[in-house]
Amino acid sequence: MLSVIFILIALYIFAQIGGAFGNSGYRGKARMQLAEAKILVALLAKVAKSDGHVSESEAAMISEILDDLVRQMGGGEREREALKLVYKLEKENLANVRELAEKYNQTYRPSPSRKTGLIYFFLNLAYVDRGFSAAERRTISQICDGLGLPEHIQS
């Protein structure tokens, strides 16, 4: 029950920061494309698996995030399956975290507030299982580095 409440709180925070994966920053522009969503899901997978396992709470939250991303893209089951496959593959390879974040940063040039929102969301995902491991901290730090966030934001 407590984990359900925590997930609801995390999703509320997610909505309040403008939906780190949603269309915030896209007003007046095209919707998020599948290629961008794939990079974000890959980073999400690495944060979720960085402590060695994906908890039930994390899995439930990730499922809702995939649904939200598909809605934001205006996609359907095909896009959800594509994102699910990216998640499945990327959670097994924790070696390219910084490179993926750099690719996202260079390709999509997110605003500083969007970068901060993404990190805030990754932190919430990491803590949804009531723990924040050193491995999760390293993974999120690598994402910060790849996004070009200053050191003082990372600590």
Q: Model segments located where?
A:
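Small-residue-enriched hydrophobic alpha-helices in membranes
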Residues: 1-45, 56-155
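Catalytic "initiation/cleavage/transfer" segments centered on a nucleophilic residue
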Residues: 51
